[in-house]
């Protein structure tokens, strides 16, 4: 493949006035070129045919005729480097060049984003409970493991986005994917170094009478030290994923036409959202396999001591990341024909009021550490960018908070098991989140939204989701639980008067450490078999569930003559379930519908040399103000709705029973607060946005409309590749 050679210095087209003052002929270069010799963007004369030889007419000519010389001050063509061929250093065979297109790099970036979402947001969330059980971790320790990803990203975002933005983006991306794969392998390492998982079954703690010493046995296994290994794996995940959502997005955006960019970015983010869905499905299936594969056990998947094969998914994702990184490392600094799209983006940038924009227009700007303070200062002076960052932080707070605790909300409201609630939430997120993300980019492209119109679209989506949040004013009644919300006789219990001990189970010596709810034949839910007064005798009914007979705390049934209990929670008969699910779907859909338009607006309101750095700064703001505190804030208010806390040998554990009405009320308050802030930030951003040109749509007409047949053919090929 012929390589296009360019000089070390960028070529700047001067304005007509400056050209006249210097005595230069400002006739368009294409008119001075010899007939039949195509002119390559970035050079005055073409010495050879190349993939970049796409036009004989300068891209800025029609723009200058329509808007005057002001537009030409901003047009600079930057050197694309020594080669636009796809390959690894000197090895660039012609057969690889079929992948050297925007669609080719989009495929591999989607694969990387899918793996990142599947591992970090899928596998990690799925196996957290298993890790706590297997390695004796407390909840705050597992929370610190999850937060290590965001901590790593915040530490690396400034460095990666600033220097990677002016560097070789595919190489930054490829090495980042390799780091992600390494992090997955490190995360799975404790399974092979901690020894076998062996447990002893003791049914004495479950039934009446209980064995008091069976639960709080002193354990000094030292397995909790593996927390540091898990944190290291997550830290590598965070470092490796940092280039993906900053440099990856800008690399896609700068190599396609501005009208097609939202679609490409939407496909990229859709893959990132489908990744967690696959992670939940694959991770859930792997947890049904015993962690010590090949060894028989008496444990069942319903047992609180069961640990599934949590580590298999990380081995698979790590290997897949290594295979994905290799082709990404082979892509050039710029794809063939990409420079012609720089002119399209120039007039959509937010207009600055001083001369500092001239320095930012220098193609060498942002390549040294000396430019870092000015880069930050230029972004801080851009009110549209700041407001979009704040709006993104409010949306991130809701997304991270609700994605973390929505399964718990569904579990409490509809009396579901943890696996059922997670599966139901996954069914909501896949079409709502994935569909909203893709359609957001599709609408921006289909409606040809530019500038403030994109921000108005984000404002509309936020208002609709704000109205949908009002559904949390509804709630399902809590299932009555003996000793918590109802007395053992069935009457309502005043709030705050908890008493799990009654005359019917006083002689059972029930332990509060073992929570294993059962549903009595009287419609009440009991803390455990022991608290229901059930002896060890069992039988299996037609549905495969264990039924416990002769329970002393359950009133006798006239038909059967004795009270009995069934393992598991009582089912909910809430009639509002369909309505709640529909409106939760609406909130998720419109929240994700605005994500790609908001990202597009961010890319358009800053200058080309700063776009990667701007995305990095935005991600830092979003994570610090939204991603990290979001789950903490939602967890804090949800804990306020707790009625019964777990007693772990004298220490307070997790919440076991929530008050549904209070949980809905607190989520409603949090949702309204952050959605109102999001509406305000988008509205003010739309009001303050001032593009460099009155009509950014006119940039599309800057492309050559009249050219020779060979150039037209080349232009058609470039557009078809986009």
Swiss-Prot record:
List the Pfam families.
Answer: Kazal_2, OATP
**Function (record text):** Organic anion antiporter with apparent broad substrate specificity. Recognizes various substrates including thyroid hormones 3,3',5-triiodo-L-thyronine (T3), L-thyroxine (T4) and 3,3',5'-triiodo-L-thyronine (rT3), conjugated steroids such as estrone 3-sulfate and estradiol 17-beta glucuronide, bile acids such as taurocholate and prostanoids such as prostaglandin E2, likely operating in a tissue-specific manner. May be involved in uptake of metabolites from the circulation into organs such as kidney, liver or placenta.
Domain of life of the source:
Eukaryota
The tissues where this chain's protein is expressed are given as: Widely expressed. Expressed in placental trophoblasts. Expressed in pancreas, kidney, skeletal muscle, liver, lung, brain, heart, colon, small intestine, ovary, testis, prostate, thymus and spleen. In testis, primarily localized to Leydig cells.
Which GO biological-process labels does this protein carry?
A: monoatomic ion transport; sodium-independent organic anion transport
- Describe the reaction catalysed, as an equation: 3,3',5-triiodo-L-thyronine(out) + L-glutamate(in) = 3,3',5-triiodo-L-thyronine(in) + L-glutamate(out); L-thyroxine(out) + L-glutamate(in) = L-thyroxine(in) + L-glutamate(out); estrone 3-sulfate(out) + L-glutamate(in) = estrone 3-sulfate(in) + L-glutamate(out); taurocholate(out) + L-glutamate(in) = taurocholate(in) + L-glutamate(out)
- Name of the protein described by the UniProt record: Solute carrier organic anion transporter family member 4A1
Question: What SUPFAM superfamilies does the record tag this protein with?
Answer: Kazal-type serine protease inhibitors, MFS general substrate transporter
Q: Which InterPro entries match?
A: Kazal_dom, Kazal_dom_sf, MFS_dom, MFS_trans_sf, OATP, SO4A1-like
**Extracellular-side segments:** 125-143, 196-222, 294-307, 401-420, 472-580, 639-671
Q: Where are the transmembrane segments?
A: 104-124, 144-164, 171-195, 223-253, 273-293, 308-332, 379-400, 421-444, 449-471, 581-603, 613-638, 672-689
Q: Which residues carry this modification: Phosphoserine?
A: 34, 40, 43, 46, 50
- Bilayer topology annotation: Multi-pass membrane protein
Which parts of this chain are annotated as the region Disordered? 1-52, 703-722
Q: Which cysteines are disulphide-bonded?
A: 504-534, 510-530, 519-553
Signal peptide span: none
Q: Does the keyword Transmembrane apply?
A: yes
Protein keywords: Cell membrane, Disulfide bond, Glycoprotein, Ion transport, Membrane, Phosphoprotein, Transmembrane, Transmembrane helix, Transport
UniProt lists the family membership as follows:
Belongs to the organo anion transporter (TC 2.A.60) family.
